[in-house]
Amino acid sequence: MGNCAKRPWRRGPKDPLQWLGSPPRGSCPSPSSSPKEQGDPAPGVQGYSVLNSLVGPACIFLRPSIAATQLDRELRPEEIEELQVAFQEFDRDRDGYIGCRELGACMRTLGYMPTEMELIEISQQISGGKVDFEDFVELMGPKLLAETADMIGVRELRDAFREFDTNGDGRISVGELRAALKALLGERLSQREVDEILQDVDLNGDGLVDFEEFVRMMSR
């Protein structure tokens, strides 16, 4: 596939929101929302909705009117670096490749939410079941250009994750989740509701939320 140095990708500027400041715009719910205020959502939706609203400041929105005029500019060095950071986040064995299974989550950290069909089609085009960084840039370049809203950057997601992971062990425990929710929502959530939120987000059932589960939660 092509060389990113020879064919730099382009996309529009980003406008980050302030941490827990003014009400978020676009698709991110207000931090003041609670499950009780949203009726009786389907199982699994409530936890994602509450945590997603709390991490609303991690959402980065592209202004469509500006993006439309910026599609022809070259991708800046810091934007190439952002791709590198996202890639390295999921290159766990540091061999310079990420597998098809990690590719979807990696794409989500950059704000692109691939469908299952898209992931299947991509996996069929990947030789050897894995991609290197050059292939990743080749793949994500056009998608980053096409995105005009709801962009979530890996650095912002990592910063938001650290707000919950207070002991820095790379996982969010029940206690850490309870403390974060209490600090942000006061006493509006019961112990049972906190446990239900953790259960909804904890995909592998180990009682903890790791960064990949956190990314998937933010993609819902």
Curated annotation (Swiss-Prot):
Binding site for Ca(2+) 1: 91, 93, 95, 97, 102
Keywords: Calcium, Cell membrane, Cytoplasm, Deafness, Disease variant, Golgi apparatus, Hearing, Lipoprotein, Membrane, Metal-binding, Myristate, Non-syndromic deafness, Repeat, Sensory transduction, Vision
Region feature Disordered, mapped onto this chain: 1-45
Native organism: Homo sapiens (Human)
Gene Ontology MF terms: calcium channel regulator activity; calcium ion binding
Annotated signal sequence range: none
SUPFAM superfamilies the UniProt entry points to: EF-hand (SSF47473)
Function: Required for sound encoding at inner hair cells (IHCs) synapses, likely via inhibition of the inactivation of voltage-gated calcium channel of type 1.3 (Cav1.3) in the IHCs. Required for the normal transfer of light signals through the retina.
Entry annotated with the keyword Cytoplasm: yes
Record protein name field: Calcium-binding protein 2
A GO BP annotation: sensory perception of sound
GO CC annotation terms, alphabetical: cytoplasm; Golgi apparatus; perinuclear region of cytoplasm; plasma membrane
Membrane protein topology class: Lipid-anchor
